[in-house]
């Protein structure tokens, strides 16, 4: 019987590609991984034998890079879904660990790359207010903020102002998710930044646990649909496509947000 991939195992590969979504290096890393597996005697399955699940998996990365990158991810998935599954997975884990240690240890030259910027951003966060760091993130990431940042992250103006004044030393998972959504910032990176600024996560309530569940399941998947004539987009941290009916019936409002660039809507709100 074919080996079934669990969410956790999908996440290992997805996390690898998501961490390296800086596409100037992603292509080379995937090439290196494919070559390493082949040198160890792992042969890729034929194209026809690569499962539909592998094809679905690569679709997650089409928005991040070239068709070339998507094909490489499919090759990796094909290598890992054949005989000797556990050995393949072990090899992939070792590869990821080795490369991540090299990144964090500064052994690779990523001058002016997003990876380098992220590390410096975290270092600069020490002893600063969380909101100040987020504003730096906006400026350095090329994201076009809306007319008011607190709207961009989905918080009330009072809550945002209180955070800016340093009133809160804790941040709820719900608000942290809204920050991630508004700024397109990865959840784990937001946690690192928050802790670097001396903030902590609040004790979990039921909603926080639901949010945490989604946040920990995998990379973002965009679900776009029409609502009252406006195009909405849903960011769900999951490795599976979510049916639109399921979203509309059960996902909390905090998951919704309008597409970036809807400045006309903001202008109308301001009037």
Give residue ranges: language-model regions.
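Intrinsically disordered, charged low-complexity linkers and terminal tails
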Residues: 1-109, 113-115, 267-270
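Short, Lys/Arg-enriched anionic-surface-contact patches
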Residues: 1-16, 118-130, 155-158
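Recognition helix of helix-turn-helix/homeodomain-like DNA-binding domains
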Residues: 19, 56, 154-171, 195-198
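Short, charged amphipathic recognition helices of the HTH superfamily
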Residues: 20-39, 47, 140-148, 172-176, ...
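Helix-turn-helix DNA-binding helix
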Residues: 46-50, 160, 190
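A short, Lys/Arg-rich alpha-helix, primarily the initiator
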Residues: 107-146, 223-231, 235-254
């Amino acid at each position: 019987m074919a080996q079934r991939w669990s969410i956790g195992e999908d996440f290992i590969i997805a996390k690898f590609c998501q961490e390296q979504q800086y596409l100037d290096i992603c292509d080379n890393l995937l090439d290196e991984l494919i070559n390493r597996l082949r040198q160890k005697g792992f042969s890729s399955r034929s194209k026809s034998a690569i499962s539909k699940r592998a094809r679905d998996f690569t679709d997650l990365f089409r928005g991040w890079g070239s068709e070339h990158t998507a094909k490489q991810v499919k090759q990796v998935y094909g290598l890992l879904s054949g005989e000797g599954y556990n050995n393949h997975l072990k090899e992939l884990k070792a590869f990821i660990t080795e490369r991540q240690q090299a990144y964090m240890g500064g052994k690779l030259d990523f001058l002016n790359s997003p990876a380098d910027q992220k590390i410096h951003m975290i270092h600069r966060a020490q002893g600063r207010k969380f909101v100040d760091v987020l504003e730096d993130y906006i400026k350095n990431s090329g994201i076009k903020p809306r007319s008011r940042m607190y709207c961009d992250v989905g918080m009330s103006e009072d809550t945002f102002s209180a955070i800016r004044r340093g009133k809160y030393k804790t941040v709820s998972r719900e608000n942290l998710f809204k920050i991630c959504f508004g700024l397109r910032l990865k959840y784990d990176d937001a946690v690192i930044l928050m802790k670097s600024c001396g903030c902590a996560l609040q004790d979990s309530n039921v909603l926080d646990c639901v949010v945490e569940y989604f946040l920990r399941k995998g990379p973002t998947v965009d679900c776009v649909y029409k609502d009252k004539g406006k195009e909405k987009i849903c960011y769900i941290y999951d490795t599976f496509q979510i049916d639109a009916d399921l979203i509309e019936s059960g996902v909390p409002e905090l998951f919704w947000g309008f597409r970036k660039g809807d400045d006309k809507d903001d202008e109308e709100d301001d009037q």
